[in-house]
Amino acid sequence: MAEAERIIGTPDIPEAAGAEPEQADGESGGAGAGTERPKGRRRIAVLFAVAALAYAFDLVSKLIVVAKLEHHAPIEIIGDWLRFEAIRNAGAAFGFGEAFTVIFTVIAAAVIVVIARLARKLYSLPWAIALGLLLGGALGNLTDRIFRSPGVFEGAVVDFIAPKHFAVFNLADSAIVCGGILIVLLSFRGLDPDGTVHKD
């Protein structure tokens, strides 16, 4: 009887032994999934922190310019090479396309939506910084287009940084350009927003 029980019970031993590694694998997989989520949240936090800073600097600078500089003589910062001069720009960044204010407003809103959707898969710190700059800059100029005259979605953006022989721009434009340049560099290096690196 004991011999029969031994023969019958023997096949169960490998299965029982095999079940433990599977359980361990499942536990390690769960631990891996748990470590990825905080990483993603940290990158999203960086994205929105950078966007908030860029937006705040742009908003405060425009409020100061409108209150202190508009309808006044330009202020020379570096001789006539760099001045602060308040103007209203109905076009895109650096004064381009003034006849398409509504179109640029829609584009800015679309960029914000795309960045918000992309944030769910954001695991790369450099991409978080780049997209944060884009988001903050887009929000800054979109705020002007919605709330400033002559009307909703047709408002003129406040520009004030006036280098010699160059278009007048603002801090939101600077954030957008810096974010765009960083995205191009990251793309050339093969770094994706989810943190993976690929080589063509």
Curated annotation (Swiss-Prot):
Transmembrane segments: 46-66, 96-116, 122-142, 166-186
An annotated GO cellular component: plasma membrane
Pfam family name, one: Peptidase_A8
The keyword Cell membrane is annotated on this UniProt entry: yes
EC number: 3.4.23.36
GO molecular function annotations of the record: aspartic-type endopeptidase activity
Subcellular location per the Swiss-Prot or TrEMBL entry: Cell membrane
Keywords per UniProt: Aspartyl protease, Cell membrane, Hydrolase, Membrane, Protease, Transmembrane, Transmembrane helix
Family classification: Belongs to the peptidase A8 family.
NCBIfam families cross-referenced by the UniProt entry: lspA
Function summary: This protein specifically catalyzes the removal of signal peptides from prolipoproteins.
Name of the molecule in the record: Lipoprotein signal peptidase
Lineage per the UniProt record: Bacteria, Bacillati, Actinomycetota, Actinomycetes, Kitasatosporales
Gene: lspA
